[in-house]
Amino acid sequence: MKARLQISRRVAGLAVAAMLACLAAPPSGFAATVPALTVTLSPGAPDSRGDIPYLDVKIVADAVDATAGQPFLRLPLVSSNVQGIADALTGFRATDAKGPLKLTTHDDPADAPAGYRHWAADRTVLGPLVIEYRVPITNALNARGAAPPLELRTEEGGFSGSGGIFLVLPESTKLYRNAVRWNLAAAGPQAIGLSTLGAGDVTSSTPTSADALASTYFMGGNIHHFPDVLPAGGFSAVWQGEPPFDAHALMQWTQTLYGSYLKFFHAPASQPYAVFLRRNPVNAGGGVEIGHSFVGTFDKNTKTEDLKLTLAHEMVHTFVGALSGDDELGLSWYSEGLAVYYQRLLPLRAGVLSPAQYLADLNQTAARYYTDLLNDAPNDQISAKFWADTRIRVLPYDRGAMYFALLNSEIRKASGGKRSLDDLVLAMVERRWHGLPVDTAAWVKLVEHELGSRGKEEFEAMLAGKLVVPAPDSFGPCYTRTTAPLRRYELGFDSVVLTQPSRIVRGLVPGSAADRAGLRNGDIIVKPVPQDAIQADQKATLTFLIRRDGKEFPITYLPRGETVQAY
């Protein structure tokens, strides 16, 4: 999810800092030659509970042209396992230079890797095109289970969501001057708006695709913010609702850490970075990097220390990025593995994480990886099973981190301590800055330069599923490798159940903890539950709200199976 380089123009109720040089006005001729694509968001007035019930959307696209029957608009049916809201849109209407358009829709097949709803007109479409519709904000739980916090949610007069969930955008490769406008009159005099494009009304300073707006995150209404004056560049944060921790203090900590990241990655201090925080009733404490910013979540039990590591993790993504290629999940060993590796190392170097906290986080990764029954799954199975099984989903994170720890140790030894993993990562970052390929081939070439053919062989073995075991001294002189008896994670029934809207238990494992706790085939799991964090905690229990024979009741158990010796 990418989108950067923006101009900050205005934000209701806030003073906005002066424009920084990197966000200067568009170059001469830019406005005249590149068509505009403007999104205006108008949230409804909060109800008696403080919830914003709907969001009115207006999209104006210049220079649209499509023949009769040709799809020219689209909206994802599912985005990163988040159920889309195409069926919930109301008041949908579109007009072009000739007047109102009569539209028809068709959906991609349900098994399409990236399915959309497409709109077509009964006549030729000539821009400018104006689209208007209303999106309900229901706070409904994602029917598909585990997923990043992209869906529209509202609380205490604020709302947030990803453009990929609710923006109907031109189906075109054309470049636009993407712009965001906020109409916050109904939300109240103190309402503000922030997106990953910047604070308040913003216009992109370089031509970008319509898809960049789908990869934009929005939060608006009566929301909290840090610092007191939202800057046009650098660090900023907003959150909706009241977290169970001191959000200002946490954002001060994050701003300090962000400064150390800027130095490590040799990035300009003006590089914008925003943090969005909101409540998550299903998988609190997690988050997602989007538009070179971070969306984090919390609930009443979220601890500041845990969220710090999540923030540290997601900020790594902003600088490292992902490998280029079609199989995003299959390539995530790089981005997620590096994020886990550096989420504890960079804060330790910056002095904002203690050696004991570093060790605790390292052992959490190790325990989850070495007890994972599927830790020998080849990397080419990741994409197909990523959302269906938590044991597969965590492999790019855990196996990737252990691979990078092993690689760092070997590079240090081969170079007599003169080089490390840092040098390879910074070389990849520099390639990205210079527009050079940042792909698997580029990575393998760097590894071979350091370690010769052995480096390539170890890399290929990791992808093939061979267990990665760093040397005892891989994490420095203060730590060594030991073993301990730990139990494998065992859900106790078919994990695909948790990704399905009906969530009907099947494939119950006889004698498992789930079976002994009273779970039965045919039980309906009323609400989705997270597993990734529980899988990393040997003592964490699972609680399902079950519906059976018209009655609802909870079932709690420790989802653990056999004991194994783990590092």
Identify the meaning behind each predicted range.
Residues G13-S28:
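Bacterial N-terminal signal peptides
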Residues A32-L41, K58, A88, H434-Y567:
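Beta/coil-rich, acidic/histidine-enriched accessory regions frequently appended to metallopeptidases
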Residues I52-A86, L167-P170, K174-A185:
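Surface-exposed beta-strand/loop patches in extracellular or lumenal glycoproteins
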Residues V82-P149:
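A surface-exposed beta-strand-loop module
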Residues I85-G91, P136, G164-L167, E171, ...:
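Zn2+-dependent metallopeptidase catalytic core
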Residues V135-K174:
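Glycine/proline-rich low-complexity spacer/linker segments in large multi-domain proteins
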Residues H224-L331:
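Juxtacatalytic substrate-recognition/specificity segment
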Residues E328-A401, A414, E430-R432:
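Acidic/His/Gly-enriched intrinsically disordered linker/tail segments
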